[in-house]
Each structure stands twice: as C-alpha cells, then as structure tokens.
Amino acid sequence: MLKIFEKIFGSKHEKDIQKIQPVINRINEIQEGLKGLGDDELKEKGKALKSRIRGVLMPIEDKKKELYRQLDNPELSLEEAESIHSSLDALAEEYEEKTASALEEALPETFALVKETCRRLKGLTYQVMGRDVVWDMVPYDVQLIGGIVLHSGKISEMATGEGKTLVSTLPTFLNALTGRGVHLVTVNDYLAQRDKEWMNPVFDFHNISVGVILNTMRPEERRQQYQCDVTYGTNNEFGFDYLRDNMAGTVEEMVQRDFYFAIVDEVDSVLIDEARTPLIISGPVPNSDNSQFQEIKPWIEQIVRAQQQLAASYLTEAEKALKESPQSPEAGLALLRVKRGQPKNTRFIKILSQQGMAKLIQVTENEYLRDNSSRMHEVDDELYFAVDEKAGTIDLTDKGREFLSKLSHQDRDLFLLPDVGTEVAAIDDDESVIAADKITRKDAVYRLFAERSERLHNISQLLKAYSLFLKDDEYVVQNGQVMIVDEFTGRILPGRRYSDGLHQAIEAKENVKIEGETQTMATVTIQNFFRLYEKLAGMTGTAETEASEFFEIYKLDVVAIPTNRPIVRKDMDDLVYKTRREKYNAIALKVEELQKKGQPVLVGTTSVEVSETLSRMLRARRIAHNVLNAKQNEREAEIVEGAGRPGAVTIATNMAGRGTDIKLGEGVREKGGLYILGSERHESRRIDRQLRGRAGRQGDPGESVFFVSLEDELMRLFGSDRVISVMDRLGHEEGDVIEHSMITKSIERAQKKVEEQNFAIRKRLLEYDDVLNQQREVIYTRRRDGLIKERLTTDILDLLRDYCDSVIDRHSKNLDTEGIEEQLLRELSIEFKPDRNNLEENATGVSEELYNSALAFYRRKEEAVPADIMRQIEKYAVLSVIDKQWRDHLREIDTLREGINLRAYGQKDPLLEYKQEAYNLFIQMLSEIELETLSLAFKLFPVNPDEVRAIEERQRQAAVRQEKLVTQHDDAASVYNASPGAENEAPLQRPVTADSKPGRNDPCPCGSGKKYKNCHGQQP
C-alpha cells in the first residue's frame, strides 16, 4: 500500500530533494558569475561574507561579555544576578536565531564560492599523508544537495564513492564564517589527519584555519587546534577532552570552546555502533588486589575441563538416542544440557546444523521454561555451571560449588553468599547481646559478605573469560596485552577495557600481566555527548535502516541523496551451506576462479580468526593475497587502495576501508568490476550493506554475494530454525548449496531481530544515563562556575547563610546549645555560644547572630591572608570537594545500577526505582558538597609559603589525576538489560575490602545502593 502511494505522490526523499532544487539552481547561477573574478577578488568575496555574518553576531557577543563582567561584581544582590541570568538566556536565543538567519541568507553565495574555489584548484599537486595528490574535485549538484542537508542539521545518506568528504567542506565553510568553530568527527585518527590534509586547500585559499586532534597530542597542542575555525578529530578525542575539561584545575588547562556545530562522518558507526559504549575516564583504585584471579584460575581451568568432558558424554548419549529415534526426548534433553553447558562446542554446532536438531532443542527448552522456568533447574543441576549465551551470563550450580569445595579443600558455604538482611535482623532481635557487641557481629557479617561476594564475582568473570570470550574473535593478545576488537569494524580498540573485572579475568586466562582495577572519575555516553552540540549533522552510506533510531534519540532526519550515476552493482542472493567447512571450501574455490579470471575480490570476514583461517586455505592453494585485520592494520590504506587491481585478492574484517575508495585498475570494468564476497552475515544489515558498498562506486560495475553456513554465529543464535525448515522443504543434501530469496529473507529477519535487541539495549542505556546526565549538567555547571569566576566569596557566603539557618533549625527544638557549639567547632572551627533563652524565643535572630559572627571570622581571615592566596583557597575548596564527591557519587551510582534489575523480582520497575534512589543520592551529595566546601574554606588557613605552595600543588595534582583512559566495552551495557531473567548471577557488588570495615561513605555491602552510614552502618 505504501509503495502505491509513493508511486502516485513521490517518496519522502524525492520531496526533500525537490524542495532543495531551487537553491541548487541559484548556487550554480552565482558560481557562473564568479568565474570571471581573479583569485584575489574571489578571496575578498570570502572575507566580505565573513564580515557580514560577524557584523550580525558581534553586537550580541559584546552584550554577553558585559553581562558576564557584571556577574563578577561581589556586591551584586541575588535579585540582580537572577535578572542578569534572564538577560543572558534571552540573548542566547536571539544569538541562535540571528546565526541561523544570517547563514541561511549567505548559503547560496558561500556554496558557490566553495564550488568555484574547487574548480580553480583543479590540477594542484599537494601532499596528503606524505603522498602526492592531485586535486580533481568539483562538487556535483547531488553533492551540493548533500551539503544543504548537512547544514540543515540532518543526516545525508550518500552511496560509497559519492564524495562525502568533499560534501562536508560546504556546510563546514559556511558555519566556520561565524568564528565559533566547527567539528568534523571521524572514526579514527588516520581519517581525521587524512581528511584535514585532503580538504585543506579549499580552506587555506580563503585563510580559514584548520586543525586536527590526535590521540598523542598534549593539552597545549589541543587548545591550539580547538581555536581553529575547523577542527577534525575522532568522537573519542572530542568526548574525552570534554570530560578532561570538566576535571581541569585551572581555566588555562581547559582546551575546548563551546559546542556549536558537529558533522559526523560515518554517522551510523559513531552514533549507533559506539552508543552502547560509554566514554569513561578512570583512575586506579587504591590498594586494589588482583592476586585472587591467579589463586582461583587453576580451579576454574579444572571445572571448565570437567564441564567439557560432561558435554562430550551428553553428546555421545544424544547421538545414540538419535539413532533410535530422530525426535528422542532423551536426545533433546542431552543436547539442551550441552547448549546450557558448552554452547560453543564444535561437535555440538555440527549436530545443530542437522535437519530437525535446532527444533528438537527448542521444543525441549520450551518444555522446561514453562511456568517461569520452574523446571529449568532439572537441566542445570547436572552441570557444573549454566551458560546463557544470548544474555552473556554464567551461573555456578550446586554441583559446581561442590566441585570447587573439594578442589580447594574449603567449606562449600564459602561459595554461597550469606543472607545479610536475615543475619543482621537476627542480631538486632537477640536481646542477650549488648549494643557494642551487636555492632561487632554486624561488622563480621558485612566482612563475610564482602569476601564471598568478591570471590564469587571473580569466579563468575573467569568462567565468562573461558566460556564466552574467544581469543582472535572478541579480543587479541599483542605485546603482552589483551586488546579488545571492535565487533563492528574489526579494529583494535586501544586503551579500552572490559568492565567489572572481566578484563583482568581474560588477562589471567591468557597469562599476561593483570592490570590494576580502576574506578570511574568522569563518564558520558556518546548520545549525551553529541546532544551538547547546538547543531548536529551526519553523513554515511547506510543510515536508512536506523532512521527511526536517529530521529528518536538524536532528532536527526535522514535524507537519501541520489547518486551522480546509477548504481549497476549486482547484489546476489545468499549461498547457504550446512557447515563452515563446506562454506570455506566453496569460498576458496570461488576466489581461485576469480583470480584466474583477473577480477579483483574483497573477502569480508567478521573476525580475526576467520580471516586467518581463509588466509591459510588460500596459501595452501598458492593464491597471492593481502590480509587486513586487527592484527595487521598498519598498511590499511595501501592495501585497500590496491584492492581494485586486476586479480587482487584482499581478505579483510569489517574495518575494510570505510573512508577509503577502492578504485578499479585497468581492464577490471570489462571483467565485472570488484567482487565482494561476504564470508558470513553480520548481525546488523547495515554492516552488510557497507561491505556491499565497497563495490559499484560512481557507476562502476561490481558484484556482491554472501556465503553463509548454519554454523555461523548469527544463524546458530537467532535464525537457524526457520532457515533449516526452508532448506528441508527445498530438499537440501550434504554438500549442496542453496541460493533462494526465501533463505535471504529469513536471514534478514534474524538480523532485524538482533537489531531490535541492540536498539533496546541502547535505548535502555540512554534512559538510565539521562538520570545521570541531568546530575552531570548540574555538577559540571557548578564546577565550571567555580573555575571561571575570579571571586567565589559571594558563593561561599551564600552557603554560610544557608548553613547557619540549618544549624539553628536542627538544634533549636531541643534548645541544644552544646550541640550548636560542638557542630560549629567541628565543621567551621569557630566558637559561638548562643543564649538558651534567645534560642527558644527568637531562633531566627540567633541564626542572624551566628551568621554575623561567622562572617566576622571570615573577614578577619581575608585580612590576614593575601588576596590572591585567599582566592586560591576558595577555588581549591570548591573544586576539590566537587571532584571528590562526584567521584564517590559515580561509584555509588555504579553500585546501584549493578543490582537494580533484581528489583523486578519484587514486582518493581527497576528504572523507576533507579531514578528515585539516584535522586536521593544526588540530593545527599549536594548537601555534602555545600558543607565540605564551607568547612574547607573556613578551616584552610596557610601560615607560611610552604603551605601556600602545598595548596597550589594539590590544585595541580587534582587536575592531572587522569592516569588511564578507559572506555568500557559491551559489558558496560549489560547492566541495563531490562529483563531480570537475564541476570542469573548473584548481584555483582563492588565489595569493600575483606580486611576492613566499610567506610561511612562507602556503598553498603548489602547492595541497597545507599551509603553504609545511611543503611547498615547506622547506630542501633
């Protein structure tokens, strides 16, 4: 029905393009008029455009500067400050409106100027990444359309080879005229550097400064690059600089400007694929101990071997039962136990690909899952540990606990968590025990919980490392380090680590150095970072399949840009085999056939392991080829550029050359163009479209096909039942290949199922992070104010006023004058003796008296301490307290999130529970920030130069405390899975150390998410 309407009325994309066409005509008309100008005259046109736009914006900027200057006045009243803030808000709206209208008016002239500049640069030879390049690019009309779409704050979907990099120069040039800075976001440092050098002649012609942010740069270099009109860089670098700026100790240490306009290249990769991975800056945990991994590792290796032997016996049992009856329930149960015990067993995977086996296992599993999985324990009880591969969880069974108990010669109870609530309640109810002994006994319960919780957590992570994470698939080992491989691109992710001790577990498994545990110091999700920009746009060749997510999360519309020339690539149906062995042999034969023909072939793989397997097979056949994967990525650009030569064979993981064109060599067009051979379907249709898109650029011929087996990961986990039934109906025999549109559609349905699941994870992640994001905005705004303001005395005295009211209000009901004296002496180091009668009759007056007394003390301190030192004391008090409290708050939020899904068992919505408790923690943190800031400002009293230098040194160290950059990978997202059923493990705590009582501000070990002092640490 929808297609009928589109035929009659036109599609959305066609209507979008029709609206833009008159502007394109106007741009080309203006460009014709520019051809007669000399170079200097053309440059003057650019200067005039910039002056015109700046002339509109500068008066508003001057007004804002004046208002900010007024805010620094220490005598300013609260009402006057609020009035100024209202004026600033109004000016911000006016500024945004005038910027938009000025740029809209200048767009045709600016785009024409860029197009004419490109025309004049034709034939220019210059250096890009150390190689000579000749400029031969002038924007086509479709590229002008793409540029307008980007300027409008939308996503421009352009096919491979349509010149997205050149398109970006059009809106970048236009928005750079504002002087506010434009960010071009790419997926890696190489592309950032290359694109900056490649497009620089256009900007350089008009004296528009261009910078690039690279991973190796120092803060001083970064600041210079951000001051440029245009700055290229990766999403990670922009995001980490944002977090680092909000940890800076001085204004001079901050590197970024405001977030005005960002254009994201490969927007689907950055805003979709990376969105499950928060950006995290972390520092080492004091006194962290990784020795337990080495202690536990021998036990885990033995229990894993025992499980493997158990799985082998069940497979033998199943094979015997299947000979007697193809639908044997005994065989179904045995195979289900293998699926729950060792799902990646190669023998099991082969059986799974046989006719009717996947269905038999599913029917058996459904039987045991009835009535809320009430019988699933009958399956799992015979195993040492149960694996849920889809959910990524592992649960130690009673049999496993018994095994570990005998192995370690320790009590079986050591592998069980004590019921803290029940045991503490029993202690409280025991009237024969005095209060002091109750505290001692409770501490013993908490210590026991912490010890066992940490041990069980480490056991669980080691079991995951051995059962679910494969070397050369999820990670590689290089130079004695475990390096995560990006599941979407196949690239190594330097500096990234799995969270919650999983990375340390894999390091123990691989016998490399176990790095220390880290704690979060600052964090932001990709979604919430890019929401900081006033205007956001993106470009990619594959966005349409995720259009709804782009709009729902980022409010970004997707506009498909027509190609300059029609795409003539042939996309063939999938070729489906039963086993991987059959599939790999077929791939090797096809590659050999294509090489003999002289047609270049790009073989796309989903993992390092598969790329190396195929490489070995081709070497055995003496077929010359290049391999591009996470282990061998240094020659990426060179290999990809040569992949279009006659007879070239290139094996590449998904990383293959996004952002690098594969140009066809001489005579290749006549032989059919580049042949894309996918060795496996990826879980995302978009990644498959990207692979196909390597061929057929700019109207070139090309072919693409995917070779699939029923043993592939996607088919095994999500799609094999339906595909096997289709193959059975089509009469498939061992060794046969099936090519049918029904099969291809079934595979795409499986991919859609995974995409929906991943979208749900990303959306859930965002729902949780939105809570923290609102808190982050409050804290970062407070911190930035503390950093930028010259004087913080007014803020300190505002805190003092509230503090005095709070102290008097707290003690006036009981006329507790001693309590007032004690609190003031402890918290502010000041003496004040209130009159008991006044406290009863006029508490407000006593509060005013206290304020005046404290103010007089503070004024005397100001007179005694040099003004510049006093300003440093105030700044240090504000910044150091915010940093410490925010760091502690992030740890508490982590602890809260780890166990929040368990609330679903109590018929409560985990998200609502999380919002409420996170809010309570935040309010409590703000209260503690205010008290500690005030206390530090009053108590810190340097009396000699050494103490002054100590304050300066502490400020400097606070800003530099960024020992390790860590972005937590997939494991970070698992916390947000909505289903409590996916959480088969005991709640993963970040326990207190086993040899000490929890600190008052540490998370309570009971898992409530509250501070110890407000939970089980309360005095009885």
Swiss-Prot record:
Q: Which reaction does it catalyse?
A: ATP + H2O + cellular proteinSide 1 = ADP + phosphate + cellular proteinSide 2
Q: Which cofactor does it need?
A: Zn(2+)
What are its GO cellular component terms? cell envelope Sec protein transport complex; cytosol; plasma membrane
E.C. designation(s): 7.4.2.8
Answer yes or no on keyword ATP-binding.
Answer: yes
Enzyme class label: translocase
What exactly does this protein do? Part of the Sec protein translocase complex. Interacts with the SecYEG preprotein conducting channel. Has a central role in coupling the hydrolysis of ATP to the transfer of proteins into and across the cell membrane, serving as an ATP-driven molecular motor driving the stepwise translocation of polypeptide chains across the membrane.
By sequence similarity, the record places it as follows: Belongs to the SecA family.
Quaternary state and interactors: Monomer and homodimer. Part of the essential Sec protein translocation apparatus which comprises SecA, SecYEG and auxiliary proteins SecDF. Other proteins may also be involved.
Name of this chain's protein: Protein translocase subunit SecA
Annotated organism of origin: Chlorobium phaeovibrioides (strain DSM 265 / 1930) (Prosthecochloris vibrioformis (strain DSM 265))
